[in-house]
A protein has these predicted regions:
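Metzincin-family zinc-dependent endopeptidase catalytic domain
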Residues: 1-201
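Extracellular low-complexity, Gly/Ser/Thr-rich intrinsically disordered linkers
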Residues: 205-214
Length: 214
């Protein structure tokens, strides 16, 4: 199906709007995890006014996108890098389990969904979008600006995974044997890590083989 997004012009209460809410917060940043031993994504606090974030609009009618300062990942003082965004698809764990095998979210890990529909949507780092953003590219990562990160995360929201199926080589996963659930994308061994090598071909897919970046 063809899907088209546009800024909302009517809010959940029926009032006219430009679809943008600017919320003042005392929080300097929102963290992915409060500590390295936690499975709770505390960054989701940006989605609730009670934790100094902003409440979602009806997720059955709106694609919510939160923009905030996402704290960089670090473990015991060792900085691991900056997360520019993440997304929850618009389905929950119970529905995914009940319809396993049907097209709900193709080949999407159930533990990466949420039963709380109020967190479903996209979160973006504030440096990763806007043509007149004075903070854009402050880290030198031009690959993420001008909405590229938004396109990437909205694709996740719609159920598209990374083409290496999110295999983790660190834990011994073989990306060539882990699929993304989409038949016409080539297998890829691992993430390209921002290197745009259009000739790279890390997996052999037989007669229908294509480079990783097509």
């Amino acid at each position: 199906p063809n899907i088209e997004f546009f800024l909302a012009n009517v809010d959940p209460n029926g009032n006219s709007t430009n679809g943008i809410i600017r919320k003042y917060t005392e929080r300097e940043e929102f963290l992915m995890f409060e500590d390295i031993f936690s499975n709770e994504i505390t960054l989701d606090e940006v989605k609730f006014s009670e934790t100094d974030g902003s409440d979602a609009w009806d997720t059955q009618k709106y694609l919510n996108i939160w923009v905030c300062n996402i704290g960089s990942l670090d473990v015991l003082g060792l900085e691991l890098g900056q997360v520019y965004g993440y997304a929850y698809p618009p389905t929950n764990i119970d529905d995914a389990l009940a319809t396993l095998g049907d097209v709900v979210v193709p080949d999407w890990p159930v533990d990466m969904l949420s039963n709380d529909e109020n967190v479903q949507g996209v979160v973006l780092h504030y440096t990763a979008l806007g043509r007149n953003n004075p903070s854009a590219n402050e880290d030198g990562m031009t690959e993420n600006n001008l909405g590229r990160a938004a396109v990437h995360e909205v694709a996740h929201y719609l159920g598209l995974r990374h083409i290496w199926g999110d295999a983790l080589a660190f834990f011994g996963d073989d990306g060539c044997s882990v699929d993304d659930g989409i038949e016409d994308t080539p297998n890829q061994d691992a993430a390209s890590n921002f290197v745009c090598n259009f000739d790279q071909d890390t997996c052999s897919d037989g007669t229908d083989d294509f480079p990783d970046m097509v």
